[in-house]
Amino acid sequence: MKKKHLLLTTLFILTGLYTTAHACTTAVIAAKNSASGKSMIWKLRDTDNLENAMRHFEDGKYTYLGLVNANDSLGEHVWGGANSAGFAIMNSASYNVNVGDTTQLKDQEGIFMKLALQTCASLDDLEKLLETYPKPRGQASHFGVIDANGGAAYYEVNNWT
């Protein structure tokens, strides 16, 4: 009986670790809630692509540093970063926001974040970009965003909203 209990407990723990290992972890901290008085974002990027790189870009209104897959030689998909205006963005995949949606377009979050880093200086700029971005978006994500004005927010985004 003790062996069976130990085996079941071990399997339960290992199952929990497996699930946890594939969960993306993020945090958005507003300036008023941080010891330094500055907003912060944090992301543990869980991805099947284990080789990542930071790249400097000068292809937009603002220069920016972006996290890319190392094999993305053109830097088309940026998976988080910060620009020269003090705007920063990252995402956490949200697999349940497009349930029942038959749209085939998906995995466009990196393209969207690249555009946001190129063009946005504030949360208001990002909200305008979200309003005007073509739909369906090909996105299933929570975007964590901060700006130089002390703004900090999460945005839940799917193909249509």
Model-identified regions with their sequence ranges:
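Bacterial N-terminal signal peptides that target proteins for export
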Residues: 1-8
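Intrinsically disordered, low-complexity N-terminal regions enriched in serine/proline/glycine
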Residues: 4, 17, 61-63
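Composition-driven detection of intrinsically disordered, low-complexity segments
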Residues: 8-9, 66
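Bacterial N-terminal signal peptides
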Residues: 9-17
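Sec/Tat signal peptide C-region and signal peptidase I cleavage site
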Residues: 17-23
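A contiguous strand-loop segment
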Residues: 23-108, 132, 136-140
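The feature marks the mature, well-folded catalytic cores of soluble enzymes
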Residues: 26-29, 41, 112-124, 128-131
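Accessory structured domains or lobes within enzymes
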Residues: 33-35, 121-161
